[in-house]
Amino acid sequence: MAAKEIIFSEKARSRMVHGVNLLANAVKATLGPKGRHVVLDKSFGSPIITKDGVSVAKEIELADKFENMGAQMLKEVASKTNDHAGDGTTTATVLAQALIREGCKAVAAGMNPMDLKRGIDKAVIAAVTELKKISKPTSDDKAIAQVATISANSDESIGNIIAEAMKKVGKEGVITIEEGTTLENELDVVEGMQFDRGYSSPYFINNQQSQIVELDNPYILLHDKKISSVRDLLTVLDAVAKESKPLLIVAEEVEGEALATLVVNNIRGIIKVCAVKAPGFGDRRKAMLEDMAVLTGGTVISEEVGLSLEKATTSHLGKAKKVRVSKENTTIIDGIGDNDAINGRVKQIKTQIEETTSDYDREKLQERVAKLAGGVAVIKVGAATEVEMKEKKARVDDALLATRAAVEEGVIPGGGVALIRAITAISNLKGANEDQTHGIQIALRAMEAPLREIVANAGEEPSVILNKVKEGKDNFGYNAATGEFGDMVNLGILDPTKVTRSALQNAASIAGLMITTEAMVAEAPKKDEPTPPAAGGGMGGMGGMDF
């Protein structure tokens, strides 16, 4: 086992804070409408230019192991916020940096780190409650477009196209993003269905860059039981292979010998195939398989209706124009099912919605209607160069996720204003002792940081703008894009409540851990072996010769 280097207390925290500052300073340059770009070097291909906080954070790895620990923990804040809310990574990073920096200063001054953490947690819980009070539901297309525009770094064309996509497929509909072939953004709405199950084995992946499985004009086999033996599949595999078509298998489980055989055949190129676990459980799984059968014009192979897998033929299989399978989701696009049958199925489910008394069942039935009737909207991102395309696509991804978050939990005034209003509402909060109260004050000061950073990136004096915003009420704030003050909601500057809430909670979580850190352990650097002296030149007695 390699030797370890251990550092304690103030030395440990200062090294960690230095790492946090290095990462946060690179990320926070991107915050706000006048945030700057960051250029990321790639070992292959051209550099990437981005204003996406999480993309910057993911690239940073520091040489000093102790500083790197701090940077990696801060990176976790950005990643967690991105995974949960889809946006707010830079806000979370700015909040975490402010909490960690002030918290570690207080610990160095002799305060109890555990009480500081309790104070911060108390302030965050109160602030989140206040944010929920300020939050307004997102109902109209205009609000959706505004949220998407802000998240896409004030790009109105992206905001409008996302609002249009949501209008066409519904708020529960599926929206995917692809690279376009023109300079303009385009929107295509394709009939389709998505469910939350991915490929059974990564060996099915045929698009290495995106790490997904893409099948064009595939047959679709639907089965309600486990498939373990390859013997059951031979008839279907032979028939599909003869037609040189891909095959998607959706079953309760594909395992053992059957899965191994499919993987081998796929790798050898004998048949392009992908196996996926059927969504849902029990009766709901059967119902969803029936939905897929109606959508693709196939039949569910089930012993209950007298069909066995060994006797299945291509006439029992469904068909679709395209199937896309990722690690977590499967999307069936443009199934060849009969429109009358699909409409009949939708009516049947809507009748069940009216009759059910369970909220959970109603929600699941509504999801099924959305998947059957809503279709899939495809946003094709247009750009002049590949570098611009990648940057723009990342912004569209962010905007879409932020919009979904807004639909889920509502919106609050943007530009850091909601946090300032939350500070005002909880400014009299007190802890159980002096150190806890100081922890609360640290959290309240940290909540000013996003507004300060937005203003600083716009080239203005943060303290002056902050004081003016504090003097105002409700939605009054500062529009950094135009340099004007006004009602943030009327100006269309909105943030999803879920994004700000997640950013604050994740920042406080990591900050609490760092403030209470007392020791750090890392592998000790290896000492370089002394190099042996170089051999003498020439043979003895030949010193006078010139070579």
UniProtKB/Swiss-Prot annotation:
Q: Under which main EC class is this enzyme filed?
A: isomerase
GO CC annotation, single = cytoplasm
Q: Which UniProt keywords apply?
A: ATP-binding, Chaperone, Cytoplasm, Isomerase, Nucleotide-binding
Q: Which residues bind ATP?
A: 30-33, 51, 87-91, 415, 479-481, 495
- What Enzyme Commission number(s) appear in the record? 5.6.1.7
Q: Where is this region: Disordered?
A: 524-547
User: Which superkingdom does the taxonomy of this entry point to?
Assistant: Bacteria
SUPFAM superfamilies per the record? Answer: GroEL apical domain-like, GroEL equatorial domain-like, GroEL-intermediate domain like
Q: How does it assemble?
A: Forms a cylinder of 14 subunits composed of two heptameric rings stacked back-to-back. Interacts with the co-chaperonin GroES.
Protein family: Belongs to the chaperonin (HSP60) family.
Q: What does this protein do?
A: Together with its co-chaperonin GroES, plays an essential role in assisting protein folding. The GroEL-GroES system forms a nano-cage that allows encapsulation of the non-native substrate proteins and provides a physical environment optimized to promote and accelerate protein folding.
Per its UniProt record, what NCBIfam families does this chain match?
GroEL, PRK00013.1, PRK12849.1, PRK12850.1, PRK12851.1
Q: What is this protein called?
A: Chaperonin GroEL
Provenance organism: Xylella fastidiosa (strain 9a5c)
UniProt gene name? groEL
